[in-house]
Design a protein with these regions (language model features):
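Catalytic cores and adjacent flexible loops of soluble metabolic enzymes
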Residues: 1-286
Length: 286
């Protein structure tokens, strides 16, 4: 197995957003400050979206005031779903990266952002401009990259066409998202290798969902296809609450770290810190 530098993205925002109870703001701050010391490339910790739609993350601005990076190089990422939220997000100096969910499935895009794909593409363009002006990065999460449960037309050409549309807007980082956890290792390998070969100018990540029984082969397939950016959430909690189908949890970031460590691949992760945070996650999400 060849070596290439790995970027692990920790997504407590994804783990929290669908919980039936609210986590106190101070507990979030304490947890995120601990995560900032682990060595993750990026921390996806909050969002500037409708507070009614995602009440769990309504305190993102307050959380930001309590975060202390110290010497951490971890980038702070927030999710936005509209231009209004993006303009608020870029006004906060500590925020490094905005993430926008753009779906291959038109049905899911309507469910998730209440926009058509055409309108969403216009939204991406405006958000990209706001990020450029504020010197922030923008990651597009390509939801339903491996198929959808709605019967919407799906094939690899549709995915490639959507990616090409994003790149024309100047997007440089795209995460292929298996939103409902249905992707097979074969699909992960074939699509990931295809997009990397077709669009060498972009960076592609994988935001996979899956069960404890099937995550490893998916990750191996993605890595062998050339992917070097992987999302996860400690404990494997979470899953998108807006799909209309049963939620499948995130990949457990500790499992990801352990697997890469066994392959003698460098992740930049501090083992004692990630162990401590894994214990915190168990208590926080219990």
């Amino acid at each position: 197995m060849s070596k290439h530098s790995l970027q692990l993205v920790e997504c407590p925002r994804d783990a929290m957003q669908g919980l039936p109870y609210l986590i106190p703001t101070q507990k979030k701050i304490d947890y995120f400050n601990a995560l900032l010391q682990v060595g993750f490339h990026t921390l996806d910790f909050g969002s500037f979206v409708s507070k009614k739609a995602v009440p769990q993350l309504a305190d993102t601005a307050e959380v930001l005031t309590g975060l202390h990076r110290g010497e951490s190089n971890t980038k702070l990422l927030v999710i936005v779903a509209a231009v209004k939220g993006a303009l608020e997000a870029v006004s906060y100096q500590p925020v490094d990266v905005l993430g926008y969910p753009f779906s291959v499935s038109p049905t899911f895009q309507l469910k998730n952002t209440r926009q058509t794909l055409a309108d969403s593409l216009d939204t991406v363009s405006q958000i990209k401009e706001a990020c450029h002006d504020a010197q922030k990065d923008l990651v597009v999460y390509l939801s339903m990259s491996f198929g959808n449960p709605y019967g919407d037309e799906y094939n690899r050409k549709i995915v490639l066409d959507q990616i090409e549309s994003q790149l024309r807007l100047g997007i440089k980082i795209i995460a292929l998202a298996d939103t409902v956890g249905h992707a097979t290792p074969k699909q992960v390998y074939e699509l990931t290798s295809s997009v990397i070969q077709t669009f060498p100018e972009a960076q592609f990540g994988l935001h996979l969902h899956g069960e404890k029984s099937n995550w490893q082969e998916k990750v191996k397939a993605g890595y062998e296809a050339g992917c070097n950016r992987f999302d996860g959430a400690l404990g494997g909690f979470g899953g998108c609450p807006f799909t209309g189908s049963e939620r499948v949890g995130n990949l457990d970031t500790f499992d990801l770290f352990s697997w890469f460590d066994q392959q003698h691949l460098e992740t930049g992760i501090n083992k004692s810190h990630i162990l401590n945070c894994a214990k915190m996650a168990t208590q926080l999400f219990a």
